[in-house]
């Protein structure tokens, strides 16, 4: 939860988490008083008490292999940052073995564009366009329901894949960017391609092995292209 405004919502979210079997609550700059949070948590007070607190979004993000952001505000195909998938499509998250964070924004205006850009996936909950925003705890309930539902559907057949960690993903993205830069497309197009690639790989929940394989391909491709360029000079 990023900068939640009301302690009551923190407690309600903790209660929802306990309903669905989740225990690890993380908050960025929560309100100083925790009285309402404990009051609304009912039997989930322990989740509030054990919550991890971070001072900034970036500090929080360093602790996760993959971040799934949430937003009621979506955009068309031209805005890559706010082009989400439906909440019903995040089921693959239960098929991975890694540290995944679900990121919920402020009650009044949600996550900023900069924060969304730092997430690997953006998810939205389909609602009526006349009133798109859900109460924070209701949003959490819908997302957690989808995850638990998918886990129960897969049941004993669920085989978890080792998710690429943050370092592996960052290295892969950097090597991809270096490869794209060889084509001298300009800063704007390079950044756009980089963002697109990050979104695609985020939605794919790439494994560590897949990530390292792609990293090797990008690195070798860049080396060969640069070698060919030098030979043609």
Predicted regions mapped to residue ranges:
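Post-transcriptional modification and biogenesis factors for structured RNAs
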Residues: 1-233
């Amino acid at each position: 939860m990023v900068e939640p405004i009301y302690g009551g919502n923190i407690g309600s979210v903790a209660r929802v988490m306990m309903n669905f079997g989740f225990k690890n609550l993380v908050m960025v700059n929560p309100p100083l008083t925790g009285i309402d949070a404990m009051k609304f948590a009912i039997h989930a007070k322990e989740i509030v008490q054990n919550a991890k607190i971070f001072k900034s979004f970036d500090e929080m993000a360093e602790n996760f292999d993959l971040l799934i952001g949430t937003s009621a505000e979506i955009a068309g195909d031209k805005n890559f940052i706010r082009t989400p998938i439906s909440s019903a499509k995040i089921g693959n998250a239960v098929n991975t073995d890694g540290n995944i964070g679900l990121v919920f924004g402020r009650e009044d205006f949600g996550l900023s564009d900069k924060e969304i850009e730092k997430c690997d996936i953006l998810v939205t909950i389909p609602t009526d366009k006349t009133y798109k925003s859900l109460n924070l705890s209701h949003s959490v309930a819908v997302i957690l329901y989808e995850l638990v539902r998918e886990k129960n559907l897969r049941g004993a057949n669920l085989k978890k894949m080792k998710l690429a960690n943050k370092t592996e993903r960052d290295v892969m993205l950097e090597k991809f960017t270096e490869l794209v830069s060889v084509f001298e497309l300009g800063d704007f197009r390079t950044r756009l391609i980089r963002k697109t690639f990050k979104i695609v790989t985020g939605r794919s929940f790439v494994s560590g092995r897949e990530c390292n394989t792609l990293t090797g391909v990008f690195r070798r491709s860049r080396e060969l292209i640069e070698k060919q360029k030098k030979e043609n000079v």
